[in-house]
Amino acid sequence: MSKFYDPSQPEQSYDSPKLFGIIPIKFIVSFLQLVSIVSQILWLYSENDKIYLVLLSVGIVLNVFTVVVFIKEHKLLMRAHYYSALIFTVVPFIYAVYTFISFIELFFGDKDITFNQCSPFAYAFIFLCIYIFYLAMCRVLIKASEFQPDDMPDLDTTQGLFHYNRDAYDGGERAKLMYGEV
């Protein structure tokens, strides 16, 4: 019976990392990126200011580029996206702190608190948690891609399905053949 995967050659097959051993992290990262693109497109249709339209259009193009980078697994651009997103974590963090401070002022104030007044803090906190989760998943994906070889080795399919023939590619004149000479 022919083998599709040779366990002595782990570089022939690259298994992506999984969250809790079930969900591929690449799927999670791509899903979160697509949700971001869809939300930006919806925001684009609700916005009337031309400056925001240009900024949202540029953001959509950059997010589509990022999705392609992560699908193609371009290591350098994945790292560049991760580090720039890490730097821009300051923006949602500052917004979350601002909404927390306004929530504290509201909580210790004299007025009654309603859910509508608490919801901006809750939304900011949920967004910040999802953003940090996204960055953590990107980091795991980048770490896993560092162990993946850039070029998969050549496979010799003439002597069996996906059996790696080291002797045929090491520069030697003689290769060991699995079949007899004719």
Curated annotation (Swiss-Prot):
A Pfam match: DUF5373
GO cellular component terms, A-Z: membrane
Topology of the protein relative to the lipid bilayer: Multi-pass membrane protein
Keyword annotations: Membrane, Transmembrane, Transmembrane helix
Subcellular location, record wording: Membrane
Annotated protein name in UniProt: Uncharacterized protein C48B4.10
Transmembrane helix keyword on record: yes
Highest taxon of the lineage: Eukaryota
Main location per the UniProt record: membrane
UniProt keyword annotation of Cytoplasm present: no
Organism the protein comes from: Caenorhabditis elegans
Ranges that cross the membrane: 19-39, 51-71, 87-107, 118-138
